[in-house]
Regions:
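Pepsin/retropepsin-fold aspartyl endopeptidases
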Residues: 1-139
Length: 139
């Protein structure tokens, strides 16, 4: 079996709603257009979620995605429309399930576990205020 070297990307925490938080830049290809967006790394979130305006800005009819519901912090459910999209974090490119919602009530995107965390060993270092993504062989 051939092994490939893993890559490590280190991201300093950035502000999210006035607090230093584990934020990472990720490339996402929406309707054939690559853009970079900031994501809050949320190990408690199943799906990666973005506000619907990101899809609309790229010309994607997000409501053509598979409709599902995501539970948010106050316990309520919001509708999300799921799409399989190319993403890139550091040098690792992969396909991920991304949900778009008009009801996402936070000002930042969420990077969830589904289709994302399997590609990385992710370490939160609270004292240093950094999050590291180390690529791993998967699937």
């Amino acid at each position: 079996m051939r092994k490939t070297a893993s890559r490590v990307s280190v991201y300093p925490y950035d502000l999210a709603n006035g607090r230093l938080s584990p934020m990472v830049p990720a490339g996402i290809c929406v309707a054939g257009r690559w853009r970079v967006a900031q994501f809050y790394v949320d190990s408690g979130a199943f799906y990666t979620l973005m506000h619907a305006t990101h899809a609309v800005d790229c010309g994607l009819d997000f409501k053509k995605g598979r409709k599902s519901y995501a539970q948010v912090g106050d316990g309520s459910l919001i509708p999300v429309f799921l799409h399989r999209l190319p993403m890139q974090i550091g040098g690792k490119r992969f396909e991920a399930t991304v949900g778009f919602s008009e009801k996402l009530g936070i000002r930042f995107n969420l990077l969830g576990r589904q289709d994302v965390f399997q590609h990385f060993k992710i370490c939160f270092h609270e004292r240093r205020k950094v999050v590291t993504f180390q690529t791993v062989e998967c699937c």
